[in-house]
Amino acid sequence: MSLQAQPPEASEPETPHLDFAGTTPYEDYVQADVLTHLQHTLSDDPGEMVFLVTTQVMELWFTVIVHEWETAAKALRGDDVPTAVAALKRSVRELEALNASWRPLAQLTPAQFNSYRAALGEGSGFQSAMYRRMEFLLGDKSASMLVPHRAAPRVYAELEKALHEPSLYDEVLRLLDRRGYAVPDAVLSRDVSQRYEPSAEVEATWTALYSGDPEAELARLGEALTNVAELVWRWRNDHLVATRRAMGAKAGTGGSAGVAWLEKRAQKNVFPELWTARSHV
């Protein structure tokens, strides 16, 4: 009786390449040394490091999400809905990761926050230029939000460009118009540097789309946008709750009304007609 051939023994793993002429290829690509030396705390409280790193991580997620939404907007301009939907779906996973960034800060007590709050000076999240670009892409625009960045020419120029470009939602509505759906001229020709305001006609268009085949391309686009909008709403509410726990109703570090200002922001829906149309389907 012949013996079955035995599988060859797994070879021992090769020793990884450890000797490099300069810095490692990983470092050259990721620049981890740069990233991990950007933390310059201004107090002796150990909690400040957590606050600072968490905020920096949020900024990185803002950057990725802006990239995705700009990719989606460009695809929509070219009538490439699948590419736009793919970018929006990626941004949903990234928004989930962004929202999870609140966890290290979600249960700060006033005493803990006060231990290093003075180090923030007048610094405040609403001064984030990359977050502002996110808001502009969502259609929530205000020229006054450029003012804090007047002393930073590159940042100011990027924000000014974003202010005057169509938002992601503007590109969606222009696509619907090109596909033969009723989008009023007042919406299509509006001043895109202004905050988007809801339209009854746009609501009727989404109602018609949602009354049809749920697997249709534009219906799937609508759901991808709704997923984005929901997570933006959750981000705003997580910010509100974390702030309320850490400082109550005190004024914000940047001179805002703090919780009252965040409450007003949290009440706003992104892509409003995608929500109101559901009442008519």
Which stretches of residues belong to each language-model region?
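Surface-exposed peri-terminal alpha-helical interaction modules
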Residues: 2-281
